[in-house]
UniProtKB/Swiss-Prot annotation:
Protein name: Phosphatidylserine lipase ABHD16A
Enzymatic class: hydrolase
Annotated source species: Bos taurus (Bovine)
EC number(s) stated in the UniProt entry for this protein: 3.1.-.-, 3.1.1.23
Membrane topology according to the record: Multi-pass membrane protein
Encoding gene, per UniProt annotation: ABHD16A
Catalytic activity line of the entry: 1-heptadecanoyl-2-(5Z,8Z,11Z,14Z-eicosatetraenoyl)-sn-glycero-3-phosphoserine + H2O = 1-heptadecanoyl-sn-glycero-3-phosphoserine + (5Z,8Z,11Z,14Z)-eicosatetraenoate + H(+); 1-hexadecanoyl-2-(9Z-octadecenoyl)-sn-glycero-3-phospho-L-serine + H2O = 1-hexadecanoyl-sn-glycero-3-phospho-L-serine + (9Z)-octadecenoate + H(+); 1-octadecanoyl-2-(9Z,12Z-octadecadienoyl)-sn-glycero-3-phosphoserine + H2O = 1-octadecanoyl-sn-glycero-3-phosphoserine + (9Z,12Z)-octadecadienoate + H(+); 1-heptadecanoyl-2-(5Z,8Z,11Z,14Z-eicosatetraenoyl)-sn-glycero-3-phosphocholine + H2O = 1-heptadecanoyl-sn-glycero-3-phosphocholine + (5Z,8Z,11Z,14Z)-eicosatetraenoate + H(+)
Active site as annotated: 355 (charge relay system), 430 (charge relay system), 507 (charge relay system)
Membrane is among the record's keywords: yes
Compartments, record wording: Membrane
Its job: Phosphatidylserine (PS) lipase that mediates the hydrolysis of phosphatidylserine to generate lysophosphatidylserine (LPS). LPS constitutes a class of signaling lipids that regulates immunological and neurological processes. Has no activity towards diacylglycerol, triacylglycerol or lysophosphatidylserine lipase. Also has monoacylglycerol lipase activity, with preference for 1-(9Z,12Z-octadecadienoyl)-glycerol (1-LG) and 2-glyceryl-15-deoxy-Delta(12,14)-prostaglandin J2 (15d-PGJ(2)-G).
Gene Ontology biological process: monoacylglycerol catabolic process; phosphatidylserine catabolic process
Annotated AB hydrolase-1 domain residues: 281-407
């Protein structure tokens, strides 16, 4: 009877993975058939085959879930319509509640029938036995057996806790349950006294900004967190998950962040290979509709690196909602997991981000200054210009205030706090992070990210002449035109390197540098072009084109 109840309340099972020969071992869970511990020895297909009763019940419950999601998103309009028609009176609501209660009882009955279907299936019974054993005892053998199954991630046991590192338990400088530290935006109106009256005057605007951010704004910024999109992508995500586990020998793990969100991760270990880059770990930060199952992790994987992918809060197996604070909290526990559980030193970790993932990557670079390098692909300096691009001009004040208070993705500001090597990859036909049209390459916000970065590190070089010539170089529409500008100013790379190395030897590596202070205008132009060319690579593609492995290069450093 207890097993039947477990089948009724248990998670949905999607797939049973093929085990590698090296991982086959006798089961430590009593009553485990050999056909489950060694899937190759059975006739079962690796995709879980539910019995008819479970299959049809699952379809009904999935349909109900979709209808509930549609009802949730359309509820404001529905309530407004019902109110206008007078259907929200007590005489109308009571019968409706009876109908709703009856429907819930019917769905509960369907869930019980699904449980009976699972109970009659030896595959599911064995899975639930292993899952319960793993929750009771987190032994390596139980976890190894559980990793052979792909199921609803909400039931996966937590593998790593944000407080697990001993240094955090002893130190007060780490994150609290309120979250890790973020850079806060400056007040919109400097010098204004923050009196009680002023706060009352601002209250309507603040309430409006909050409502916009938590309804329309967050879903526009992170469409991957919308349930209906995830439901549509589920087959693709399951296929990507299977590829990472079966072909790349990936290991899935659940991390618990300081805000209570559970973060879904996938680790592919290449340290046992002969390739030297396998000793380096690339932590991948996905875009606003990207998932590690089908995202940018494929690029460093093809290049031979060890890779750690993770999903934003609210994406696929990760819980929560993707606001900046939650994003940073998630990134923090991912980095801690890489260092304290996977055993990588910060000097062996590379941050690779695509698009909006630049926020979490630059936050981690700022917060963990010993990290080896940062690679930002198709990223931007600040969210405000991109948000203004897609909203009406009359909403400018509301959009700016909402972004600054609730969705402040200040990539450039965070990147300037990092001292290590950085490479920016600019998509020359990017249709997402341009503020006009893709053909107008100067409206690409990757340009602004580069300029702010160079102006922070080399303020004397990037003054007037240097800034002007770098803008000309960024405006070039082809590699030939870039080379023409580079040769027009007769950039001597050996001279540039000697100037930078001599300055570093005399003053140390800490940025910003005052190099170029006593230099001629021509010297500053040469140095500015040299530095821009070393920190930015062009990729002839649109925003969503996967980056080829040959374009995944380590950043330049002295």
């Amino acid at each position: 009877m207890a097993k039947l109840l477990s089948c009724v309340l248990g998670p949905r099972l999607y797939k049973i993975y093929r085990e590698r020969d090296s991982e086959r071992a006798p089961s430590s869970v009593p009553g485990t058939p050999t056909s489950v511990t060694n899937p190759h020895s059975s006739s079962w297909d690796t995709y879980y085959q539910p019995r008819a009763l479970e299959k049809h019940a699952d379809s009904i419950l999935a349909l109900a879930s979709v209808f509930w999601s549609i009802s949730y998103y359309s509820s404001p309009f529905a309530f407004f319509y019902l109110y206008r028609k007078g259907y929200l009176s007590l005489s109308k609501v009571v019968p409706f509640s009876h109908y709703a209660g009856t429907l819930l009882l019917l769905l509960a009955g369907v869930a019980c029938l699904r449980g009976i279907g699972r109970w009659t299936n030896p595959q599911y019974r064995q899975f639930i036995t292993i899952l319960e054993a793993t929750h009771r005892n987190h032994s390596a053998e139980n976890k190894r057996q559980l990793a052979n199954y792909n199921f609803d991630f909400r039931s996966w046991p937590v593998d790593f806790h944000w407080e697990e590192p001993s240094s955090r338990k002893e130190s007060r400088g780490g994150p609290s349950r309120r979250g890790v530290a973020l850079l806060r935006p400056e007040p919109l109106h400097r010098g204004t006294a923050d009196t009680f009256l002023n706060r009352v005057k601002k209250l309507p605007c603040q309430i409006t900004s909050y409502l916009v951010a938590h309804t329309l704004g967050r879903r526009m910024l992170y469409p991957g967190s919308v349930y209906l999109l995830q439901k549509a992508l589920m087959p693709v995500l399951l296929q990507g998950q299977a590829r990472l586990v079966e072909e790349c020998h990936g290991r899935r793990a659940k991390l618990l962040a300081c805000d209570g969100n559970e973060i879904d991760t996938m680790f592919v270990d290449r340290r046992g290979t002969a390739e030297p880059q396998g000793q380096k770990l690339v932590i991948c930060c996905e875009g606003n509709a990207g998932f590690y199952e089908v995202g940018c992790v494929s690029t460093p994987l093809e290049a031979g690196y060890s890779v750690l992918g993770w999903n934003h809060p609210g994406f696929a197996g990760s819980t929560g909602v993707p606001f900046p604070q939650n994003e940073a909290n998630a990134m923090d526990v991912v980095v801690q997991f890489a260092i304290h559980r996977l055993g990588f030193q910060p000097e062996d970790i590379i941050l690779y981000a695509w698009s909006i993932g630049g926020f979490t990557a630059t936050w981690a670079a700022m917060s963990y200054p010993d990290i080896s390098a940062v690679i930002l692909d198709a990223s931007f300096d600040d969210l405000v210009p991109l948000a203004l691009k897609v909203m009406p001009d009359s909403w400018r004040g509301l959009v700016t205030r909402t972004v600054r208070q609730h969705l402040n993705l200040n990539n450039a500001e965070q990147l300037c706090r990092y001292q290590g090597p950085v490479l920016l990859i600019r998509r020359t036909r990017d249709e997402i992070i341009t503020t006009t049209v893709p053909e107008d390459i100067m409206s690409n916000r990757g340009n602004d990210l580069l300029l702010k970065f160079l102006q922070h590190r080399y303020p004397r070089v990037m003054a007037e002449e240097g800034l002007r010539v770098v803008r000309q170089w960024l405006e070039a529409s082809s590699q030939l035109e870039e080379a023409s500008i580079y040769s027009r100013w007769e950039v001597e790379e050996d001279w540039c390197l000697s100037v930078l190395r001599s300055y570093q030897a005399e003053h140390g590596p800490e940025f910003p540098w005052s190099v170029g202070e006593d230099m001629s205008a021509d010297g500053r132009r040469q140095l500015a072009l040299f530095l821009a060319q070393k920190h930015l690579n062009n990729f002839e593609a649109t925003h969503c084109t996967p980056l080829p492995a040959q374009n995944f290069q380590m950043p330049w450093h002295l």
